[in-house]
Amino acid sequence: LTGVNSSFSDNAATGQNANGGNGGNGGAICLDGPAQSGDKDIAIDICGPIRPGTETAIPASTPEDLAETADLVKNLGRRIVTAEVDVRDYPGVKAAVDSGVEQLGRLDIVVANAGIGNGGDLLHETSQLDWDEMIDTNLSGVWKSVKAAVPHIISGGRGGSIILTSSVGGLKAYPNCGNYVAAKHGVVGLMRSFGVELGQHMIRVNSVHPTHVATDMLHNEGTFKMFRPDLENPGPDDMAPICQLFHTLPIPWVEARDISNAVLFFASDEARYVTGVTLPVDAGSCLK
């Protein structure tokens, strides 16, 4: 079980972008997307474990990680505002978004990328705590992030783009991670509902559905052991053949940049009339 981040970016060229932006998919989105389309960012991150006082297989993000992301963005010649915020904390998210827009001027693009991963239990054996943390972060956290941002997009009067990070697990089911699957399916419902309601403001809403991504949420001791319980000390090379079985393409996982490229498309003018789309970046996983 681990917590990840959320971030918000202000884009001078195409507006402002909100996304999960401190390492992994979020870091790639922050660095690749805005680098191509604008020059201002707002990044928020939990900067700590999702469950304080506990150790997890996946290292929790830190204030230093967020500062490093900010430095990388600044090195690209862009402005960035950061805040340590948990997406479960709506007042905190709203305050960060409001402050960022006040400092940077506008909001046109939202990428709701924050989320956690856990697994191993059958759904009927999942603890109440694990269920609540998953839904509160991966579903309610997405809703809270978009809720905080939408008034700024509407008031700008320019339309905009909202991109929600779901998962292949938001399009199909897998055993032993039912709370994750339920939350990610819920993200699709959020995407479609926001899309129906916000279309009148020329705000497009879409979702991206990654398969395994080569980040710390996949490459960690707990996941290695989950995929290869037959080995005493499994590593990524031991897990790769199992991961490849999920795909029609002969690869075990995709890279964070593959996700940021999909996000960049949805945020761009090339997708100006694209809304309500569930886009798998899955190496053919949905075909199996």
Q: Model-predicted segments: where are they?
A:
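Short C-terminal tail/terminal secondary-structure segment
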Residues: G120, K172, P250, V263-L264, ...
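Substrate-binding pocket helix/loop in short-chain dehydrogenase/reductase
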Residues: D121-L123, S127-I135, C243
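Active-site helix of classical SDR
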Residues: V146, A183, M191
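Glycine-centered low-complexity coil/loop motifs and glycine-rich tracts
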Residues: V4-P34, K40-I42
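Residue(s) in the substrate-gating loop at a strand-loop-helix junction
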Residues: S167
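Short, small/polar-rich loop/turn modules that mediate ligand/substrate recognition or access, typified
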Residues: G199, R204, V274-G276
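Alpha-helical segment proximal to the catalytic Tyr-Lys
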Residues: P151, V196-E197, R272
